[in-house]
Amino acid sequence: MAGGAVPNLKEKMQVPKDEDLLLGSFRDNQECSVAAEMKEHMSRLLGASQRRQRVDPKAVGSAVVWNTAANQSKKMGPQLRGVGVVGEQGDGGAQPQENPGGSQGMRSQFERRELNTLAEIGLEELNELEMEIMRRQLFMITERLRYLEDQSATWHQREVLLFTMLLSSCITNLWLWMRQ
């Protein structure tokens, strides 16, 4: 399944006609904006260390579409295979050269389905990602808490030692003062 998805995606990314150039550039802009939004949301979730890494929006967009097709075919099974899943069985609405008159309407329906699926899969993956991030943060917080507890115990021992030394010196001074 995954091997067949890559060549079909490459074929669909190439625009053969002049009229499709406008639609293709609009689709590319949409993919870039969706990829940028996802990248921004992921960077907010991952924190400052992950923000430093920069990813090419076109690479993210093509990887997301490929992952969408693979994940969708695994999750939904045969129900959606003929309904416009990228890399699965052919669909007349997905390729503009087969239906030139109604290609814009069919393409927008295909893109809406693709974006909805992308949003669903993205949320599931983000939930898993958020859980992993929370686990790591919980581990770091636990380690820091252990360190602070050890530090607190050490300070408590030092305070007790200092207090006993102060008390013993006061008693010694009192005894010496009384002897004079």
From Swiss-Prot:
Bilayer disposition of the protein: Single-pass membrane protein
Biological process annotations from GO: apoptotic process; negative regulation of apoptotic process; negative regulation of mitochondrial calcium ion concentration
Compositionally biased spans, kind Gly residues: 84-93
InterPro entries named among the record's database cross-references: FATE1 (IPR039153), Mff-like_dom (IPR039433)
GO molecular function annotations of the record: ubiquitin protein ligase binding
Chief location of this protein within or outside the cell: mitochondrion
Localization terms from the record: Mitochondrion; Mitochondrion outer membrane; Endoplasmic reticulum membrane
Keyword Mitochondrion part of the UniProt annotation: yes
Bias kind Polar residues: ranges: 96-107
Coiled coil feature spans: none
Signal peptide: none
TM region(s), chain numbering: 160-178
UniProt keyword annotations, A-Z: Apoptosis, Endoplasmic reticulum, Membrane, Mitochondrion, Mitochondrion outer membrane, Transmembrane, Transmembrane helix
Function: Involved in the regulation of endoplasmic reticulum (ER)-mitochondria coupling. Negatively regulates the ER-mitochondria distance and Ca(2+) transfer from ER to mitochondria possibly implicating it in the regulation of apoptosis. May collaborate with RNF183 to restrain BIK protein levels thus regulating apoptotic signaling.
Protein name: Fetal and adult testis-expressed transcript protein homolog
Species, as recorded: Bos taurus (Bovine)
Lineage, opening ranks: Eukaryota, Metazoa, Chordata, Craniata, Vertebrata
